[in-house]
């Protein structure tokens, strides 16, 4: 009895303390609300002006788009209407190339080989971990919900798919990592094309003769060899920045400059100044971003031919992708950030709000890169050496949303075709989806191109990608937002894990600057004295 009474007393005391704490917090909140002045409201609005304007732009753009849909605007009218949004995309894409090069060069040059190696390893481990988790989530969700019930005969098809083999796509990825011409890499990527070529294939006579029907064997063989054709790979190219090649070159170049010490100081200062100038241009463009996002979203809604597709045949598929992306973006990534850093992930994500909304509007992680830099460095205070290293690489190869989408879409197409996948084929899909997402450049709808590789790996019809193109414009924006969130949280995690190396580097740089300043003075005095002595000697000789 005494024990139970003691436990009840302790529980009662805890409840009372909890209630007192709640009452105190409530009173403090009331006091804060009562003490809010116009100046406080103005300062809050000024601090969060970008975010508030961007959120307002998304809401107004959505309403405006649905309001204008009944007017059935022509293609030309839609393009004119979307022109302010097109300007935003062009301005952001204009800054991507110099930003990737300058940020990676300065980021690598600011770190020693040991620190950059550790940071790079942590970033790669994070990228691979989150991508594999995303693929697993996509596979589990699509198997549980099973959105591919029914038949594909009544489903709407849209667009055409370019055929590509997995081997050629992988080789193209490796080739693009090492561009032969850096200038060309700024506007072109290598891509294998296919041509039909005729070949003379030797055929044994016993394979073509059937009794006495064919009298002239040589003539029959000649006829057969003329129609024998094969698709052969030939070198080609497509327009677009070869981001992967520029990332590899910039990392190597920055690493070399960092090891050159004093000799590389001029180059370090040049790229540092270039990076700072680009970020100042970004600050100017950010004021225009809300207007551009408004017209991008409104224009895309007006441009859609049939809104019923999302709510009709592909409704369950769309819901499945959204659920998978939400689980990864709202649960997995914040939880991973909290487990590593022991910090509130939602405060960190709050500082990224404008970058996430820009990703939603532009559907391009590369175009969002300038805004992501601004949000991480200014709002969340992430070390510039980390953002300059992690973000450009992440925007190029870390695509969690794309990997999740490709694995999920491949299994959806298998379900639509009543194709039963075994465990080995599901593993194959997960591996190829992970690899294909690395090869997907940060450009709109790149996932559709790389998904051909995933479908080919398990023998699924690649033409069935046309079944899901109708909703890809919408899902592309969601997975791009997930990609940007993954890159940004990765920068926060890598900074936390690399804090000791960064501090040690700061100490080393401080000591080296002091030593350099001390060494310069006596050197200048000696050189001046030696010049005076030389001139005196020459005068006496004269």
Curated annotation (Swiss-Prot):
Native source organism of the sequence: Bos taurus
Residue numbers binding L-aspartate: 363-365, 402, 443-447, 476, 483
Ranges per topology, Cytoplasmic: 1-47, 109-122, 261-269, 341-345, 377-385, 495-542
Protein name: Excitatory amino acid transporter 1
Domain of life: Eukaryota
GO annotation (BP), single: gamma-aminobutyric acid biosynthetic process
Membrane-related topology note: Multi-pass membrane protein
Annotated positions of the Phosphoserine modification: 512
């Amino acid at each position: 009895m005494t024990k139970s009474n003691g436990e009840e007393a302790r529980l009662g005391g805890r409840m009372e303390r909890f209630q007192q704490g709640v009452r105190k917090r409530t009173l403090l909140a009331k006091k804060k609300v009562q003490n809010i002045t116009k100046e406080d409201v103005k300062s809050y609005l000024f601090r969060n002006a970008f975010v508030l304007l961007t959120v307002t732009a998304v809401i107004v753009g959505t309403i405006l788009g649905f309001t204008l849909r009944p007017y059935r605007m022509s293609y030309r009218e839609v393009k004119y209407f979307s022109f302010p949004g097109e300007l935003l995309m062009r301005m952001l894409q204009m800054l991507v190339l110099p930003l990737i090069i300058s940020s990676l060069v300065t980021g690598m040059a600011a770190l020693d080989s040991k620190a950059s190696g550790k940071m790079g390893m942590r970033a790669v481990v994070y990228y691979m971990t989150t991508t594999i988790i995303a693929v697993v989530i996509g596979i589990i969700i699509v198997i549980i919900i099973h959105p591919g019930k029914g038949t594909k005969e009544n489903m709407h098809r849209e667009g055409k798919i370019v055929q590509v083999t997995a081997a050629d796509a992988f080789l193209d990825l490796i080739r693009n990592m090492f561009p032969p011409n850096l200038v060309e890499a700024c506007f072109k990527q290598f891509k294998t094309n296919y041509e039909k070529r005729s070949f003379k294939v030797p055929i044994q006579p016993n394979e073509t003769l059937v009794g006495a029907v064919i009298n002239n064997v040589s003539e029959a063989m000649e006829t057969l060899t003329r129609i024998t054709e094969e698709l052969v790979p030939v070198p080609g190219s497509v327009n677009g920045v070869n981001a992967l090649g520029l990332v590899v070159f910039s990392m190597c170049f920055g690493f070399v400059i960092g090891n050159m010490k004093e000799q590389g100081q001029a180059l370090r200062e040049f790229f540092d100044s270039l990076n700072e100038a680009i970020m100042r241009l970004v600050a100017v463009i950010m004021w225009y971003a809300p207007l551009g996002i408004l017209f991008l979203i409104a224009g895309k809604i007006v441009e859609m031919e049939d809104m019923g597709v999302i709510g009709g045949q592909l409704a369950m598929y769309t819901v499945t992708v959204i659920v998978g992306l939400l689980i990864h973006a709202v649960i997995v990534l914040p939880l991973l950030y909290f487990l590593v850093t022991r910090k509130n992930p939602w405060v960190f994500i709050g500082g990224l709000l404008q970058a996430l909304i820009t990703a939603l509007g532009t559907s391009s992680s590369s175009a969002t890169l300038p805004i992501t830099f601004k949000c991480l460095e200014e709002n969340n205070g992430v070390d510039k050496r980390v953002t300059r290293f992690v973000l450009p690489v992440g925007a190029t190869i870390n695509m969690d949303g794309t990997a999740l989408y490709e694995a999920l879409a491949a299994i959806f197409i298998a379900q639509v075709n009543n194709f039963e996948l075994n465990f080995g084929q599901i593993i194959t899909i997960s591996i190829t989806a992970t690899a294909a997402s690395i090869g997907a450049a940060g450009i709109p709808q790149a996932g559709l191109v790389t998904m051909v590789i995933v479908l080919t790996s398990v023998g699924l019809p690649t033409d069935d990608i046309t079944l899901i193109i109708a909703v890809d414009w919408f899902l592309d924006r969601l997975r791009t937002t997930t990609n940007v969130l993954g890159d940004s949280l990765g920068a926060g995690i890598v900074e936390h894990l690399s804090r000791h190396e960064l501090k040690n580097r700061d100490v080393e740089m401080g000591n080296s600057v002091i030593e350099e300043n001390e060494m310069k003075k006596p050197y200048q005095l000696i050189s001046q004295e030696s010049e005076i002595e030389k001139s005196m000697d020459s005068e006496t000789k004269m």
